[in-house]
């Protein structure tokens, strides 16, 4: 069945809210990324399109799960997709050495895109802080807040941390799969990226 929403809205075959499309709009071909909490190699993945269609380089970090069977199942799914040539580290995102990861993969610390999405949200914030404190300077950060269900405003907490490092809010009130009641992310940009703050409902419309 034809999806009429695609006529009017920016929708990705892979990411939940078009994070990959936004990154490509900003930086085009041959970009760089770090994907924290990558999850499935394709479904819901923010960097699959960028790596396989647009020649982006980078790496993913995902512990998997505390349940070893679930963790091994996720690892096996990645092995079934050889088109995912960029490295994935099966590691704890909070204690991972991101500068070492950047160096091992011949990347620059000024990466284009950081996707930050692990559970619970407190750990997502901790992982974000670890990246920045390791000296990495992403131009775009897609940060999961799960605002629709969290008692804390993790978007505000992330902004309060990032603002002294010269970041601004790029896209606010990002919702999942065109469900306006499911605000779950904020997209931050470095101040040197020429982009004015907008609401996601404005960005996601094609016309």
List the predicted regions and their residue ranges.
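Conserved amphipathic alpha-helix within the SDR
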Residues: 101-107
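SAM cofactor-binding core of SAM-dependent methyltransferases
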Residues: 9-99
């Amino acid at each position: 069945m034809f999806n009429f929403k695609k006529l009017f809205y920016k929708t990705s075959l892979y990411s939940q809210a078009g994070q990959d499309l936004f990154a490509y709009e900003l930086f085009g071909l041959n970009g760089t990324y770090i994907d924290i909490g990558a999850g499935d190699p394709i479904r819901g993945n923010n960097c699959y399109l960028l790596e396989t269609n647009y020649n982006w380089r980078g790496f993913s970090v995902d512990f998997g799960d505390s349940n070893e069977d679930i963790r091994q199942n996720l690892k096996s799914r990645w092995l079934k997709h050889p088109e995912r040539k960029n490295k994935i580290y099966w590691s704890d995102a909070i204690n991972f050495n991101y500068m070492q990861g950047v160096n091992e993969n011949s990347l620059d610390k000024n990466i284009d895109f950081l996707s930050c999405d692990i559970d619970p949200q407190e750990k997502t914030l901790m992982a974000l802080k670890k990246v920045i404190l390791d000296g990495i300077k992403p131009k775009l950060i897609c940060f999961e807040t799960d605002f629709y269900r969290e008692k804390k405003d993790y978007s505000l907490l992330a902004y309060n941390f990032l603002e002294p490092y010269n970041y601004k809010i790029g896209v606010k009130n990002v919702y999942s799969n065109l469900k306006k009641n499911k605000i779950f992310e904020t997209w931050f940009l470095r101040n040197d990226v020429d982009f004015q703050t907008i609401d996601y409902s404005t960005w996601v419309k094609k016309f």
